[in-house]
Curated annotation (Swiss-Prot):
Organism: Rickettsia felis (strain ATCC VR-1525 / URRWXCal2) (Rickettsia azadi)
Family to which the UniProt record says this protein belongs: Belongs to the UPF0053 family. Hemolysin C subfamily.
One Pfam short name: CorC_HlyC
Name of this chain's protein: Hemolysin C
GO process annotations (BP): killing of cells of another organism
SMART domains: CorC_HlyC
Domain CBS stretches: 80-142, 145-202
CDD domains in UniProt: CBS_pair_CorC_HlyC_assoc
InterPro entries on file: CBS_dom (IPR000644), CBS_dom_sf (IPR046342), FAD-bd_PCMH-like_sf (IPR036318), FAD-bd_PCMH_sub2 (IPR016169), Ion_transp-like_CBS (IPR044751), Transptr-assoc_dom (IPR005170)
Gene Ontology MF term list: flavin adenine dinucleotide binding; toxin activity
Length: 299
């Protein structure tokens, strides 16, 4: 996902150094294997053999190998940030206007730029380019700061996307649907986290602490993208059937209502559960309040 850029540069450098050391250590036996043998072998076959003979590996190294194996079958659709969660800026935005807006909130490291609508993404800007332009008192529009992105389909394999990003020398891919509209985005950080696991920074930790809060015995505040299984585990009640196509609490609400309900709408999910919409846009749910009529101890 798009990351916060302040106060975390040094910690990310340390994480990157550890990542490089671990990856080098892991891939050393793979390199040696291909040097010693002339027999054609599948890359993932080698990794599977390494995983089997991994007694000398640490838990982190084993986890990375396991993630690499899973990566073989994963597609962009599995990890992309959905359109409703994309933060973007209009191409016509003035640099001075943007500088005023970022004083009020933590800026992203990279932000998409669109012309007209989000279906026409023209590229992205890096926050360091913006700060440099502001420091040198460059006036005008964002156009001269725009960097290129790549286009990808939801069905594209993650390894293919990683290779394409490397060839094109860019860190952002816009995911488009069959009609050419913007469906989501994937960043290089998303791909790295699929291999090494989630890399938290201070901003992520703050977001996580607000994602799912048990306020008291009868009230829970939740991000709409939290998995239904999390709520089921807390309350001890089954909310999703095997044939249901949703995975999140927001999906549960949308399935019951049939559309995006307005803020303040209350939906009876079961005899014990009522969900109130506390934050939403015309296209998606953001946050809900879950009321347990019989309390958490009812299970």
């Amino acid at each position: 996902m798009l990351k916060s850029s302040k106060k975390e540069d040094s910690s990310k450098k340390n994480q990157n150094n550890k990542l490089i050391f671990t990856v080098r250590k892991l891939f050393s036996p793979i390199k040696n294997f291909f040097r010693k043998t002339k027999t054609p072998d599948n890359f993932f076959g080698v990794i599977k053999r390494l995983k089997i003979n991994s007694q000398k590996m640490t838990l982190d190294e084993r986890n990375i190998l396991a993630n690499l194996l899973e990566l073989e079958d994963k597609t962009i659709e599995d990890i992309m940030v959905p359109r409703s969660d994309i933060a973007a800026i209009k191409l016509t935005t003035n640099l001075e206007e943007l500088s005023e807006s970022i004083k009020l909130e933590v800026p992203h490291t990279r932000t998409l730029i669109y012309d007209g609508t989000l279906d026409n993404v023209v590229g992205f800007i890096h926050i360091k380019d913006l700060f440099k332009a502001l420091a040198t008192k460059q006036n005008g529009r964002l156009k001269k700061l725009i960097r290129k992105h790549i286009i990808a389909a939801p069905s594209m394999k993650l390894l293919d996307l990683l290779a394409k990003m490397r060839r094109e020398r860019t860190h952002i891919a816009i995911v488009v649907d069959e009609y050419g509209g913007t469906d989501g985005l994937v960043t290089i950080e998303d791909l790295i986290e699929e291999i090494v696991g989630r890399i938290d920074d201070e901003h992520d930790q703050q977001l996580d602490s607000d994602n799912f809060k048990v306020i008291n015995n009868s009230t829970i505040i939740s991000n709409a993208r939290v998995e239904v299984e999390v709520l089921e585990e807390i309350i001890g009640e089954k909310l999703k059937n095997d044939d249901d196509e949703f995975d999140t609490i927001g999906g549960l609400v949308l399935t019951r209502v049939g559309s995006v309900p307005a803020i303040g709408t209350r939906i009876d999910i079961s005899e014990n559960i009522e969900i109130e919409v506390t934050d939403a846009t015309p296209r998606s749910l953001k946050q809900v309040k879950i009321r347990l009529k019989n309390g958490l101890n009812s299970k």
